[in-house]
Every structure is written in structure tokens, then in C-alpha cells.
Amino acid sequence: MREGGHYPGQCRKKAGLKALDPDTGAADAAHIRAKEIVQSFSHTRPDGRTCFTAASDLGVSYRTAGENIAYGYQTPEQVVQGWMNSEGHRKNILSSSFTKIGVGCYEKGGVLYWSQFFIG
């Protein structure tokens, strides 16, 4: 899902920010979260813990983190455009606090579930 990290980079470049570096740990957390939001479309995990425990459970260290979630979009470009049209999601994409990104996508019943996981 590398292209999922490409489109936020374009948005950041337009805003005069450095692109986010792809991160394997953040991507692994994003993949876990994309599967989980099928059960519970929330930043709280199905077990009741915060979404950020998906990264810490994997041993990913970070000082700051953020998450964007979505479903129903068919392409990385469409989902990023949807996030950019939402103030809270746009803040995550354009935050100078984040330096790395991981993107996850999971398909269930013909519907795509998306997660962006940001760390800094």
C-alpha cells in the first residue's frame, strides 16, 4: 500500500511540508487497525483500548501518533481526498509533529476499510 503514503506526501508538499517517510511498524499497525474497524469503526479498538496500542503492542516506539480511518473509498487517492476534506483528518496529514506513516487497507464484503497511522 505504498501508494497510500504517496498521496499524503503530495498534500504535504503543497503545504510546504516534508513528505512522511514510510515506516514498517506504522504500516503493520495500520493493517491491524484496518481489519479492526470492520468490527468497530472507532479510534477505540474492539478490546476497548486506544488505537495507538496497535503500534505499542508491536514494539513501535513514538513520541506522538495519530490515526485516520475511513471506509467505502475505492482508491488511495479517493480516501486521501476524503480525509483532506475533513478538518480533523487534514490536521493529521499536515501535522509537522509526524515524520512517518503507515497505511493499511482491508477488504470485507466488497468494502474497503482504510487506516493511516502517523508517528513522530
Predicted regions and their residues:
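A short alpha-helix/helix-coil micro-patch that ends at or immediately precedes a cysteine
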Residues: 1-39
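Residue-level preference for nonpolar/small residues embedded in alpha-helices
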Residues: 3-4, 47, 85
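Extracytoplasmic/cell-surface-exposed regions of Actinobacterial cell-envelope-associated
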Residues: 14, 35-39, 52, 89, ...
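Hydrophobic side chains within well-formed alpha-helices
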Residues: 22, 26, 51, 65, ...
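Short, surface-exposed glycine/acidic/tryptophan-bearing loops
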Residues: 27-74
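Disulfide-stabilized extracellular recognition modules
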Residues: 71-120
